[in-house]
Each structure stands twice: as structure tokens, then as C-alpha cells.
């Protein structure tokens, strides 16, 4: 490797309160330092890139400071793979955009030859990695099964794990068969790892989300249908109650009106009958009073 890549080193597992002048104090004796780029991710540990004037100085710094104990943190010093002289996106591709090789935010490694990482669809996930594992350690171990084009180490609630991309399908299948349940080791730790085919979260979440959405829509439609039927049944059941409640009132009002209407007729009818009977009796009483004079005239 030539150019700026060979003059730049990657320093990982730095303390969270590290300053640039402290980094300069650690590496100044190996040669003239051109630039120091310190990275402080949201989660520790920190890491940095140090660029020397000569590539020989960078090699001496790696030999002298790799494994150096700084305030209880064991430094990891290695040659920067695409970490310097590239854009920020290339740096993220070379080192995962943050964190050292110790899982403090993850690390990704691309091709050491070109300093550029590339992904593929032939991906495996590696569980059971020690917390001190770096992407370079993972790549070196998984390279036993085939050509690795990308490696990344990160951490979740289950611990430290890695993602490895192979250039072809056969190497991926061979890695699952050969490297599953094998011992992984680096200078600081060792452990048995599990290697499985990587399944993206999208493919996992698609089918449940569809089934859930369908079941929810069905349950909602059923619930709505039931609510409509209940509302209809309630409206139907309420209607007779209203009729029943209204009908007695109407019948009562009608009965009351009927009972009220004849009462004045009855009260008024007796006077009419009395007046008629009185008039008839008067007429009858008048008629006999006129008859005696006629008899008298006949007798004369």
C-alpha cells in the first residue's frame, strides 16, 4: 500500500475523555505527525486517525503502541484501511462510521487492498463474539471459508455480533457449514461463535405486518358490522318502546277526550228534554182550557 493510506494509522479503544494533544504525546516520538483526526461517537470508546509524514513512521508506531495500556484502556493500533484521504462516506465504509474494533459503536472493514468496502447479498451473521473483537479480527477468521468483501462488528442487547459479506454463494454456504460452532480468538479473548445466514429485519417484519394488518382490518370490519347490527337491533327494539310509550298516552288522551265530550252532551240534554216536556205539558194544559168554552157554545 502506498500514498496516504500507508502513512495513516487507526487507533481504537481510546478513553472517552481523550484529547488530541494527549494522542500527540503518545505518537510524537515515532516521527513527524501531519494530522490527527479524533472521533468521539455517542457511545465510547473513542478512536482516531493519525497521519505521519513517512510510511516507515506509521509502521514503527503500530509496532510500538499496539496493545499499549492508556488509563486502563488497551489501545488497538493498525494501518488505516481507507480511513484517510477519502470522503466521509468512504471512511464510514472502512470503519462503520464510528466505534473501534471493540464494539463501542461497531466497525466495518472493506477490502484491505483498495481501502473501499462493498456489500453483497451473500451475507452471514456471526454471534458469540467477544467484546474485544474488531472487524479485522472477524474478517481474518471468516476468510478461512472464502473471499470476504465486507465485515462489520457491532453490539446489541444480546452482545457483540458481526456481519460478513462473501463474494459468492458457495463461500457463504461453506462458511456456515465450516465455521459454525468454531473457536474465535484474538490477542485478548476467545470464544465459540455461531454462524447463520443473515435475514434482514425487513423480510422478517413484512409478513407479520401484513398478517397483522389483515387481521386488524378484518377484526375492525367485523366489529363495525357487529356495531351496525347492534345499532340496528337497538333501533328496532327501541322503536316499539317508543310506540308503546306513545300509544298509551294517545289512547289515554283519546279516552279522556271521549269521556269529556259526552259529559257536556249529557249535562245539556236534560235541560233540552225538560224544556221539551215542559213545552208539551204547557201545550197540553192549554188545549183543555180552550175546550170548555166550545162545549158551552154547543150547549147554548
Curated annotation (Swiss-Prot):
It is found in: Nucleus speckle; Nucleus, Nucleoplasm. Keywords: mRNA processing, mRNA splicing, Nucleus, Phosphoprotein, Repeat, RNA-binding, Spliceosome. GO terms for biological process: mRNA processing; RNA splicing. GO terms for cellular component: nuclear speck; nucleolus; spliceosomal complex. Belongs to the splicing factor SR family. SR subfamily. Probably involved in intron recognition and spliceosome assembly. This is Serine/arginine-rich splicing factor SR34A. It comes from Arabidopsis thaliana (Mouse-ear cress). The gene is SR34A.
Amino acid at each position: 500500500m502506498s500514498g496516504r493510506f500507508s502513512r495513516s494509522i487507526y487507533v481504537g479503544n481510546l478513553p472517552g475523555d481523550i484529547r488530541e494533544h494527549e494522542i500527540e504525546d503518545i505518537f510524537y516520538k515515532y516521527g513527524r505527525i501531519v494530522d490527527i483526526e479524533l472521533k468521539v461517537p455517542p457511545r465510547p470508546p473513542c478512536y482516531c486517525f493519525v497521519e505521519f509524514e513517512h510510511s516507515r513512521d506509521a509502521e514503527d508506531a503500530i509496532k510500538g503502541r499496539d496493545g499499549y495500556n492508556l488509563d486502563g484502556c488497551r489501545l488497538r493500533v493498525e494501518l488505516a484501511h481507507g480511513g484517510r484521504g477519502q470522503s466521509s462516506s468512504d471512511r464510514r465504509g472502512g470503519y462503520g462510521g464510528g466505534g473501534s474494533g471493540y464494539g463501542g459503536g461497531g466497525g466495518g472493514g472493506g477490502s484491505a487492498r483498495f481501502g473501499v468496502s462493498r456489500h453483497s447479498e451473500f451475507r452471514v451473521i456471526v454471534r458469540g463474539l467477544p467484546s474485544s473483537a474488531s472487524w479485522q479480527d472477524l474478517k481474518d477468521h471468516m476468510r478461512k471459508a472464502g473471499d470476504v468483501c465486507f465485515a462489520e462488528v457491532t453490539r446489541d442487547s444480546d452482545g457483540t455480533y458481526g456481519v460478513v459479506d462473501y463474494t459468492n454463494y458457495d463461500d457463504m454456504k461453506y462458511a456456515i457449514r465450516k465455521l459454525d460452532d468454531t473457536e474465535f480468538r484474538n490477542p485478548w479473548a476467545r470464544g465459540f461463535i455461531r454462524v447463520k445466514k443473515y435475514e434482514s429485519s425487513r423480510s422478517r417484519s413484512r409478513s407479520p405486518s401484513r398478517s397483522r394488518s389483515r387481521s386488524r382490518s378484518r377484526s375492525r370490519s367485523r366489529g363495525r358490522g357487529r356495531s351496525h347490527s347492534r345499532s340496528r337491533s337497538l333501533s328496532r327494539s327501541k322503536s316499539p318502546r317508543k310506540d308503546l310509550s306513545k300509544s298509551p298516552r294517545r289512547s289515554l288522551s283519546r279516552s279522556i277526550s271521549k269521556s269529556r265530550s259526552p259529559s257536556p252532551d249529557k249535562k245539556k240534554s236534560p235541560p233540552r228534554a225538560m224544556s221539551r216536556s215542559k213545552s208539551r205539558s204547557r201545550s197540553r194544559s192549554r188545549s183543555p182550557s180552550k175546550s170548555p168554552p166550545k162545549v158551552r157554545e154547543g150547549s147554548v
